[in-house]
Amino acid sequence: MLNLYGRKFSSRLMLGTAQYPSPAILRNAIHKSNIEIVTVSLRRETAGGKQGGQFWQFLKELDITVLPNTAGCYTVKEAVTTAQLARDLFKTSWIKLEIIGNPDTLQPNVFSLIEAAQILNSDGFQIFAYTTDDLIVAERLLDVGCRVIMPWCAPIGSGQGPHNTDGLRSIRAYLPDVTLVIDAGIGRPSHAAVAMELGYDAVLLNTAVAKAGDPVLMAQAFAQAVQAGRMGYKAGILKARNIAVPSTPIVGKAVFS
């Protein structure tokens, strides 16, 4: 079971809710893949006006756990204010904390992230911290009270898959008891399987499903890939070798006459 701030979930795949062709397709993708958690931007709710309110009502009817996020924030003040508004709107202390440092790469501003996390933790929030694959940053986020760390594996929406598996593996090795979720950069089910094989606890993605030719089928594919990767990690994956090793042991040699 996936444990997030004391709450347990069966699914280790989380989905974003943006860019789907229609609400009906989003609903089917969630149901067919047995997703239990979706993330949604407060800015979508507020900027959308009446339409945003309708979307929130749509989410409530799905009877699913909502993880609000601070997507689109560039400063500590913006992120803190957005988180506080999200708590009022969604009635949850959960917040996926994102602070962007560069508008082109959408790379997290880890300095502002740590500062905002400290403020929000002192205000009672339970933070899911979207960050880079830097171990030192992850450790600092833990120091200020975060209990779920969400390293990216590649830039948001790029679909490139894990760039730095050594870095991701290092975070897992040094933080064995921390809940780690890969967030951003996943493009195909095999990427999700790799992330889970590294020992990560869950995967969060959006574009790879929302922009697929068949989002519902792709959501199912990702759900199965995440499950397979987790099972492989738990089973114990064979380490790669530089030389061939016979898979069938030879006891003696056949004698031909």
From Swiss-Prot:
* Pathway(s) served: Cofactor biosynthesis; thiamine diphosphate biosynthesis
Q: Please describe the quaternary structure of this protein.
A: Homotetramer. Forms heterodimers with either ThiH or ThiS.
Q: Name one Pfam family in it.
A: ThiG
- Which EC number(s) does the record attach to this protein? 2.8.1.10
Record GO terms (molecular function): thiazole synthase activity
Describe the task this protein carries out. Answer: Catalyzes the rearrangement of 1-deoxy-D-xylulose 5-phosphate (DXP) to produce the thiazole phosphate moiety of thiamine. Sulfur is provided by the thiocarboxylate moiety of the carrier protein ThiS. In vitro, sulfur can be provided by H(2)S.
Q: Does the keyword Cytoplasm apply?
A: yes
Q: Which residues form the active site?
A: K96 (schiff-base intermediate with dxp)
Q: Give the primary localization class.
A: cytoplasm
Which SUPFAM superfamilies would you find in this protein's record?
ThiG-like
What reaction does this enzyme carry out catalytically?
A: [ThiS sulfur-carrier protein]-C-terminal-Gly-aminoethanethioate + 2-iminoacetate + 1-deoxy-D-xylulose 5-phosphate = [ThiS sulfur-carrier protein]-C-terminal Gly-Gly + 2-[(2R,5Z)-2-carboxy-4-methylthiazol-5(2H)-ylidene]ethyl phosphate + 2 H2O + H(+)
Location within or outside the cell: Cytoplasm
Q: Would you kindly state one Gene Ontology biological process term found in this protein's UniProt entry?
A: thiamine diphosphate biosynthetic process
Q: What class of enzyme is it?
A: transferase
Q: Which CDD domains match?
A: ThiG
Name-wise, this protein is: Thiazole synthase
**Keyword annotations:** Cytoplasm, Schiff base, Thiamine biosynthesis, Transferase
Q: What does the entry list under GO cellular component?
A: cytoplasm
Q: Which residues bind 1-deoxy-D-xylulose 5-phosphate?
A: G157, A184, G185, N206, T207
Q: Which family does it belong to?
A: Belongs to the ThiG family.
